[in-house]
């Protein structure tokens, strides 16, 4: 059977509000809908995915914006363009970068050493090598004061000052002061951190060390995460208590109450009590998606369901090479996975059927 290269779509990171995916056919770019039909016929040399209802496309030498019907909303007049978010977009014209609104009008914002795209209602602003936040009205929400601010996740972002890390919310308020050598994602009021030589959790603003632990991974979608002690990995809850004692060589996060673990040179899946639901039999295994499928590898890759049944046979190659796939979750989302077959791209559903029975020269994520 021919191998298909899966570029796996994230469990929960992307919105499908437009239900359109960028595709390339006969050297031109268009957009595919979730029924497998070309909603916008391939006509562009370069283009970006839809965001905030608009997509940046290049018409000969200039960039402009179209809507989901392919109608020009902002004429092509820019030398470069990013994605709209919160009603604003970073563009470049005559070697100058600035924000525009959905009418194509320039928007006044405070001076910044670099223009950052908006995300979740805020954008970074950098002055005198310090980073702060602005809102879509161009108002400074947080005066530039940090050496670094990481992208927001779930309304919170990691911040760094003087080699110490903390966490802020979208208003710029520090929910965890920058006091720690390392810090994790903020999950339901809890995060992991390193204080001196100790690893532990910050609960209610107080650091609680977990004895013997030398690494903790970020929380995912369930109220637990995995941690390492004495060279073995187990799982802790949001209070820092072990729910599964350290006994695995490798592990990944829980989703659908199952987590991939590595023992005896094979991967299987355990439930939240530590009992195997899928016995260790695979050369590799990834986290379940919200669609209830997980990639597993024998010689090649396939997908199993939460009962361990092989839904898509292990006849495929998979890849997570994209740098923006910054999540533990890999697999299907909303019933679709982007795939590659004999140099052509398309989309499979959870039964392994090709969406619209069409292959393309390139295809990007639905958004």
Question: At which residue positions do the language-model features occur?
Answer:
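Bacterial Sec-dependent N-terminal signal peptides
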Residues: 1-19
């Amino acid at each position: 059977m021919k191998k298909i290269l899966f570029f796996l779509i994230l469990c929960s990171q992307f919105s499908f509000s437009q239900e359109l995916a960028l595709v390339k056919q006969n050297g031109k770019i268009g957009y595919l809908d979730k029924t497998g039909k070309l909603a916008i016929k391939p006509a562009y040399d370069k283009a970006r995915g839809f965001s905030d209802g608009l997509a940046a496309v290049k018409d000969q030498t200039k960039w402009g914006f179209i809507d989901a019907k392919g109608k020009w909303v902002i004429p092509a007049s820019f030398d470069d363009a990013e994605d709209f978010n919160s009603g604003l977009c970073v563009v470049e014209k005559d070697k100058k970068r600035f924000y525009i609104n959905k009418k194509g009008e320039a928007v006044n914002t405070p001076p910044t050493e670099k223009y950052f795209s908006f995300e979740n209602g805020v954008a970074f602003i950098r002055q005198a090598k310090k980073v702060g936040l602005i809102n879509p009205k161009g108002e400074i929400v947080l005066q530039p004061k940090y050496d670094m601010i990481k992208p927001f996740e779930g309304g919170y972002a990691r911040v760094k000052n003087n080699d110490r890390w903390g966490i802020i919310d979208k208003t710029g308020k520090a929910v965890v002061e920058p006091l720690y050598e390392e810090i994790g994602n903020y999950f339901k009021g809890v995060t992991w951190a390193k204080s001196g030589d100790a690893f532990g959790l910050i609960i209610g603003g107080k650091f609680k060390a977990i004895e013997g632990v030398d690494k903790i991974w970020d929380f995912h979608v369930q109220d637990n995460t995995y941690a390492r002690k004495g060279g073995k990995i187990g799982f802790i809850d949001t209070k820092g208590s072990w729910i599964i004692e350290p006994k695995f060589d490798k592990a990944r996060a829980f989703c659908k109450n199952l987590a991939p673990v590595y023992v005896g040179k094979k991967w299987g899946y355990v439930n939240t009590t530590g009992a195997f639901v899928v016995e260790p039999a695979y050369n590799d295994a990834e986290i379940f998606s919200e669609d209830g499928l997980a990639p597993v590898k024998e010689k090649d890759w396939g997908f199993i369901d939460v009962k361990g049944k092989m839904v898509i046979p292990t006849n495929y190659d998979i890849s997570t090479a994209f740098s923006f796939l910054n999540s533990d979750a890999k697999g299907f989302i909303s019933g679709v996975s982007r795939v590659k077959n004999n140099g052509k791209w398309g989309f499979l559903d959870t039964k392994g059927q090709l969406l619209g029975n069409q292959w393309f020269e390139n295809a990007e994520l639905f958004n």
